[in-house]
């Protein structure tokens, strides 16, 4: 049986990368998209439509992804064994003292709430399977750097979600991991532009290798994978997210 990866946020820079990586491993993709226009965009950016099934859902809604899982259970969509959550993207640069409640909520809603909804909707389905499954969430180093307070706070919350998920799945069939990214990634058609090149942007098709490598390494479980430089894409570095206590 050919396995399937559910990609949430499939038309974003990281989502497209996950789609490409999954297809390279000879797996199929179930891509969650916003609307019909996003379907055409995904096929263009991924460079193919082969092996990709799309489903429209509002991932910002509390029940949007649950409706997708329900369709899978009812046989209306392909079964999936892997989840890649790549939702987010709000990047307000407003200083903390000037951040409005509206902007704060927008950052938390898009960058954190959607990831929580994704985990809650899919984890039970992964746990119900008899074979090994995986759940991967992408986070950004901005939560530690802190230069953009709105996004930074949302990433801090997402780090904690990952710690709780690691603890809950430590002795289960689900291989939960956090992929921690510290440099910009863009879809190929954007990454090759002169301004992006000056910023050191990495192409989504290159970053895709990080997911290929993670899927192949069964020993990486309950960990944070550090992607600090492009060199880390092919030589994954990771450490357990388990609580280690105070520093010695």
Curated annotation (Swiss-Prot):
InterPro entries: NAD(P)-bd_dom_sf (IPR036291), SDR_fam (IPR002347). Iso-A82775C is a precursor for the biosynthesis of the anticancer natural products chloropestolides A to E via a Diesls-Alder reaction with maldoxin. In the absence of the prenyltransferase iacE, siccayne accumulates instead of iso-A82775C and can also be condensed with maldoxin to produce chloropestolides H to K, which show also antibacterial and anticancer properties. NADP(+) binds at residues 14, 35, 41, 58, 120, 187. Keywords: NADP, Oxidoreductase. Disruption phenotype: Reduced strongly the production of iso-A82775C and accumulates pestalodiol F. Induction: Expression is co-regulated with the other genes from the iso-A82775C biosynthesis cluster and probably controlled by the cluster-specific transcription factors iacI and iacK. Pathway: Secondary metabolite biosynthesis. Disulfide bonds: none annotated. CDD domains: SDR_c. GO terms for molecular function: oxidoreductase activity. It comes from the Eukaryota. Pfam families: adh_short (PF00106). Its EC number is 1.1.1.-. Short-chain dehydrogenase/reductase; part of the gene cluster that mediates the biosynthesis of iso-A82775C, a enylepoxycyclohexane and biosynthetic precursor of the chloropestolide anticancer natural products. Within the cluster, the prenyltransferase iacE prenylates siccayne to generate pestalodiol E, using dimethylallyl diphosphate (DMAPP) as cosubstrate. The probable oxidoreductase iacF is then involved in the epoxidation of pestalodiol F to pestalodiol F, which is further converted to pestalofone A by the short-chain dehydrogenase/reductase iacG. Belongs to the short-chain dehydrogenases/reductases (SDR) family. This is Short-chain dehydrogenase/reductase iacG. It comes from Pestalotiopsis fici (strain W106-1 / CGMCC3.15140). The gene is iacG.
